[in-house]
């Protein structure tokens, strides 16, 4: 694997020994320390929107062919969903989805973007001759007012790492509840989160054991905190040891905001004899209102996307035999101090020929 992003978690054994990362008694919601909490309170929202003012992040997303071409295909191959409709593009960025909709015959598109990129989107819309069809509105969806009482279609690319990181989903649901006409559609309308297990000895050693000797100094006290940080990276499909299990499917057209916080059980069956160093989460997105169901996957056996996969390293190395099972549950919740962060509680057990263990780990995507 090649390193990319990070986040944060903690772990505790089921033998009641709890590790105190981020005040682990409330580790599903507490921050690392008081200074970090203050920084989060001051900068989290501003930093989030400011990050989308930079061209690099938009270049990465636009060059993600799986992502962008999927939306283009959905719109162009299913023009009946868009033609003569009023469309709301939530988190429009450069306005690419709005442009797709305008070209597909939308009556009007309202492109809402909170970052400074809104000004650039206006230029792009004008340069492409769609100023009469696309109106770019700069501001938060929760604060702006549309010039129309209702829209027929809401389209958004709201998904973050681990599907729910950055929590733009709540913004889409707010827009749906406020502006979507009865019988209107949300694109995409389904998103599913999955988990599997992988062998990853080389990278785990590089990420964790590295701290034992850093230029001749012992920094091993960092090891546990290092292992608590989920990694966003591309996983080789050959690393997968078990089958994959669905954690949750969310129906964006019907769900409530609170439904994005949940606990889901899982049972992973080993497909070969191997060692397990991490669990991996990924998601699929579906557009079920099309002539034929369309969508894409961010799984390790699919074409790579900028979302990659989210790797949750385990404190232990699990030795597993073909047919043995890892059972457990994953709890996912918004962080109370910064709702754009995601807190993860992972509990798992393996009762196998070579390994008998039960543990609970806490992670934070931040």
Curated annotation (Swiss-Prot):
Keywords: Chromatin regulator, Cytoplasm, Methyltransferase, Nucleus, S-adenosyl-L-methionine, Transcription, Transcription regulation, Transferase. Residues 45-347 form the SAM-dependent MTase PRMT-type domain. GO terms for molecular function: protein-arginine N-methyltransferase activity. It is found in: Nucleus; Cytoplasm. The active site is at residues 157, 166. GO terms for biological process: chromatin organization; methylation. It comes from the Eukaryota. GO terms for cellular component: cytoplasm; nucleus. Transmembrane segments: none annotated. Its EC number is 2.1.1.-. Belongs to the class I-like SAM-binding methyltransferase superfamily. Protein arginine N-methyltransferase family. Methylates (mono and asymmetric dimethylation) the guanidino nitrogens of arginyl residues present in a glycine and arginine-rich domain. Type I arginine methyltransferase active on both histones and non-histone proteins. Mediates the methylation of MED36A. Interacts with FIB2 and PRMT11. This is Probable protein arginine N-methyltransferase 1.2. It comes from Arabidopsis thaliana.
